[in-house]
Amino acid sequence: MYQQSLINPVSDIVTIQGAFLNSKALEERRNLGQFFTGLVVSDYMASLIELPDEKTVRILDAGAGTGILTASAALHCLKIGCNSVHAVLYELDEKALPALEQTLHIIRKIFQSRQASFTCEIYCEDFVLARPDKNTSVQSFDVAVINPPYFKYNVKYGGFI
């Protein structure tokens, strides 16, 4: 298991992502449409988030991977004054879940150190096929950070080609 440093948690998140990428063959990642977002892009995307009126910011990450987009978004929310963030993450690749959980653990610790709250739900399923938009009990989201898999969906039969 990866040991978190107390000095630079963002660097730790990048290290977690790198270790996961190095653990998978390129062909396997291609078959799943996995092309992970880097820190510069995820930080830029997060910088576009404005402080909403809600007390708790709700983030949707529909292709979570190792969680770098959620991490950047949550940390930006904390930086601009939001002390409560709830993330709902979908990740199709079961093998990515340990790295994703490590990232979310780091985010929780950062929030706790600032007397703030970070909570999350992880779903190991295909966001497109799960159709959470059809569930009337699902709360809306303030932020969606999405780097979806790169492959074609078979609209007629569900699943991807």
Q: Where are the language model's segments positioned?
A:
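SAM-dependent methyltransferase catalytic region
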Residues: 1-161
